[in-house]
């Protein structure tokens, strides 16, 4: 199990990916402790001096004008968690819950939240013990923070609700006991600090980004394979073309294609003197389209990495000035817009792949047997596999609708503009699954097309891609049950079988 020292505000994308993919043992950087303690001292001073400060000794939302008596402050924080745990939907998986918890710890440990070190350490203990709170997927509008999902997370700290430990759902009290942990009692401001923040929205979108990176790499490899299968030209990847335009994503994608295709291959030599002048756009414009997608991936990375390291609590404690200031860092609009842009990229990666599949089906365009199978008529070959890819591409067009332009006022119009970032991030998972299915069909089709070139081979890297598939899925000599082959190719893609052939591009 990986051990990670968490320096608040300095998580890298690779660290976040590791947290999502694997259980982790966290250690808090000791340099963070003074800032955490100073923010708590500031909150305690406000209470002791009888000053009124939102979230410390007031109600919440529209009830912010209601002053809470000192003797009720602890109960106020507990009541906040219980009442706000109002989510619906399916439970999030352990990987997503773990990522949300680490993001929450990272934010709280920045020292602007007025939450005791002991509570942060209790969250770290949950991560290290593998105790995963039951967080329901739906119920947040991404402002004021991800209240419902983070309340469900916080229930476990209180010994309420349910949690999963070693794969079993248990009452939270039982899960804590089995893991050797104890519930905590929250002090002033701590319930609000736990609930306010964009950590669920950010985690949802980060998963979308991680999957989009794999899809992008896989699609570039399959696009190169298809270029070979249909006797496409290498000329459109010439560096001079892309330098003349100056779009960095496009320049970098063309370089990836040159890396995969190399200068030539046996397939390329076989049609070196052909009379074709230009390839269809789905081949020729791959650097332009995929380059635009890469730019979106890179911009999304910047936004999400900043948000993963952000303080998105409210109010914020500025201990050096002895002030608590209300603001709006909980509003997840940056995450929502980043997720919307990422959705466009995921949809386009799949759409371009589907067009290349369709190209291979057409004997006039591909110079291959119709639907990539001999004895057509008796055999239907890839006919319906292409229809499946088209269906998935069409679904993604609807799913790519922007969420950040939607808003419904909540909390009696106190919270009158919201981001819808959780939904924006969560739909990326379905889009990624759809696009992975499309790319799986293209991988199958492109390898079949190269097989039909009667022993001609492609570049070394593309032959690796073909061999990886052929170790699991045989060449089609006649029709057979097709769905298991798509499932197998999809699983290989999810494992990064093609991603490892592509140099780092982020």
Curated annotation (Swiss-Prot):
Q: What is its EC number?
A: 4.3.1.3
Where it sits in the cell: the answer is: Cytoplasm
Which UniProt keyword terms apply here?
A: Cytoplasm, Histidine metabolism, Lyase
What does the record give as the reaction this protein catalyses?
Answer: L-histidine = trans-urocanate + NH4(+)
A cellular component term, taken from the record's GO annotations:
cytoplasm
Domain of life, per lineage: Bacteria
InterPro entries given in the database record: Aromatic_Lyase, Fumarase/histidase_N, HutH, L-Aspartase-like, Phe/His_NH3-lyase_AS
The record's section on CDD domains has: PAL-HAL
Q: Which pathway does UniProt place it in?
A: Amino-acid degradation; L-histidine degradation into L-glutamate; N-formimidoyl-L-glutamate from L-histidine: step 1/3
Q: Which GO terms describe its molecular function?
A: histidine ammonia-lyase activity
Q: Which residues form the signal peptide?
A: none
Primary enzyme class: lyase
Q: Which residues carry this modification: 2,3-didehydroalanine (Ser)?
A: 144
**Biological processes annotated in GO:** L-histidine catabolic process to glutamate and formamide; L-histidine catabolic process to glutamate and formate
Main location class: cytoplasm
| Modification comment | Contains an active site 4-methylidene-imidazol-5-one (MIO), which is formed autocatalytically by cyclization and dehydration of residues Ala-Ser-Gly.
Question: Which Gene3D superfamilies does UniProt cross-reference here?
Answer: Fumarase/aspartase (Central domain) (1.20.200.10), Fumarase/aspartase (N-terminal domain) (1.10.275.10)
Query: Could you tell me at which residue positions the 5-imidazolinone (Ala-Gly) crosslink is annotated in this chain?
Result: 143-145
**One Pfam match:** Lyase_aromatic
Give the family from UniProt: Belongs to the PAL/histidase family.
Q: What is this protein called?
A: Histidine ammonia-lyase
Origin organism is Salmonella agona (strain SL483)
């Amino acid at each position: 199990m990986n051990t990670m020292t968490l320096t608040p505000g300095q998580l890298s994308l690779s660290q976040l990916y590791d947290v999502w993919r694997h259980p982790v043992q966290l250690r808090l950087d000791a340099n963070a402790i003074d800032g955490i303690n100073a923010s708590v001292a500031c909150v305690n001073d406000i209470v002791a001096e009888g000053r009124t400060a939102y979230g410390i000794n007031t109600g919440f939302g529209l009830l912010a004008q209601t002053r809470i008596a000192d003797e009720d402050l602890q109960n106020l924080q507990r009541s906040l968690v219980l009442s706000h745990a109002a989510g619906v939907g399916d439970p999030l998986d352990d990987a997503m819950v773990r990522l949300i918890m680490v993001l929450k710890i990272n934010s709280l440990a920045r020292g602007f939240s007025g939450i005791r070190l002991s509570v942060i350490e209790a969250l770290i203990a949950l991560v290290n013990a593998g105790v995963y709170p039951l967080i329901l997927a739906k119920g947040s509008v991404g402002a004021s923070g991800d209240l419902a999902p983070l309340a469900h997370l916080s229930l476990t700290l209180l010994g309420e609700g349910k949690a999963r430990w070693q794969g079993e759902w248990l009452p939270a009290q039982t899960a804590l006991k089995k893991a050797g942990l104890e519930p905590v009692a929250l002090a002033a401001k701590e319930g609000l600090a736990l609930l306010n923040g964009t950590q669920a929205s950010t985690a949802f979108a980060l998963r979308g980004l991680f999957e989009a990176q794999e899809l992008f790499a896989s699609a570039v490899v399959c696009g190169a394979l298809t270029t070979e299968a249909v006797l496409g030209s290498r000329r459109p990847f010439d560096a001079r073309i892309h330098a003349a335009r100056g779009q960095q994503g496009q320049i970098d994608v063309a370089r990836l294609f040159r890396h995969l295709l190399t200068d030539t291959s046996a397939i390329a030599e076989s049609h070196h003197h052909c009379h074709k002048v230009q390839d269809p756009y789905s081949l020729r414009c791959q650097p332009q389209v995929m380059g635009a997608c890469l730019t979106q991936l890179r911009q999304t990375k910047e936004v999400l990495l900043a948000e993963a390291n952000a303080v998105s609590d409210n109010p914020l404690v500025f201990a050096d000035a002895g002030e608590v200031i209300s603001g709006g860092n909980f509003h997840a609009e940056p995450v929502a817009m980043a997720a919307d842009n990422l959705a466009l990229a995921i949809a386009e990666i799949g759409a371009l792949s589907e067009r290349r599949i369709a190209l291979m089906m057409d004997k006039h365009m591909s110079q291959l047997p119709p639907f990539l199978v001999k004895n057509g008529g008796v055999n239907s070959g890839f006919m319906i596999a292409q229809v499946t890819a088209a269906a998935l591409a069409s679904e993604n067009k609807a799913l790519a609708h922007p969420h950040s332009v939607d808003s419904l006022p909540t909390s009696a119009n106190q919270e009158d503009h919201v981001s819808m970032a959780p939904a924006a991030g969560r739909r990326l998972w379905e889009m990624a699954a759809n696009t992975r299915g499309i790319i799986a069909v293209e991988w199958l089709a492109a390898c079949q097309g190269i097989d039909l070139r009667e022993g001609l081979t492609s570049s070394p890297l593309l032959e690796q891609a073909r061999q990886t598939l052929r170790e699991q899925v045989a060449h089609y000599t006649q029709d057979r049950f097709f769905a298991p082959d798509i499932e197998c190719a999809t699983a290989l893609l999810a494992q990064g079988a093609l991603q490892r052939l592509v140099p780092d591009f982020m």
